[in-house]
Amino acid sequence: GLVKMILEKKMSMDEYRNTSILYRTNKEAVQVSDLLITEKIPFWCTEPIQDKYDHWIYRDILSYHKLGIGIGNKMDLNRILNHPQRFLFDPRFFKTDGSLKQLMHVAATLPDGKWKRSKAMDSVEDMFYLFKKLEDKSPVDTLQILESFGRYKIFLHDYAEYRNMSPGELYFFWNSYKADAEKHNDWKEWDAYVRKHKIILQEQLRKHDGIALSTLHRSKGLEWDRVYILNCVKNTIPFAKQGTVEDLEEERRLFYVGCTRAKKELQLLSYQGNSGEISPFIKELKSSESDTGDKVDLDVHLKY
């Protein structure tokens, strides 16, 4: 992985300061910063980074936990009502007191035909059975139940496809939460860890020292001896919204801006497990040595 590559170099603090990790969009900084925090590698960023625990997937997990132990409120229920997809879209579902009785009443009085009413009632019953299974479960057991019986990871895949995202972007959060949950015996321990994680991230960013994290855009005017550019795959570099690249020339220019930030070494990488095509810009770059400077060592890693 990327962090392993960095650790193997056994960098000094000065070498950290002369290293940058670049990416197309700021959301990619969440994963990178978490990996660096885990390995206690110093870093800073050219713009704010969202903590991985400030994500809707973690809020879903907390809502399921609270509903499982009987302290969930209406907001918790509404948040996870269709996570995974239960097709409970009637506005009346979101106006109940959250009880099984009221939700079943809404399901039984849907105007969409008998089979849809029956399916909605089954979905409500299954949801409350899931809450029962989560009662008094540890963090890791909760996630395992949500993944298996709750079909939550399948939901993440379907959600990503619907949003034209790589499922790996959401799997990162889920798998990271699972890994953290395995290290904590109860919810109090995990909550303390979450709070500490947020503090560590903010303290690290305030120090403004170590490896620089930056979007390609924010890297303009800066230079480092060693530069890593992440996720060099089609639809990320160049960046595509809903599968469409709005300005190919601007995307190409941004990529070359990132490449020319390297004074000595340039590493181009893509996500581990990403099945996407390698960025077309890489072929262009490799065909013209002068694009990155004659003295820059260019290396392409297909995975990190």
Predicted feature locations:
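Conserved RecA-like P-loop NTPase helicase motor core
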Residues: 59-81, 213, 243-246, 260-261
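Structural motif
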Residues: 55-56, 71-72, 137, 164-168, ...
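Amphipathic alpha-helical transducer elements in NTP-driven molecular machines
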Residues: 29, 55-58, 74, 90, ...
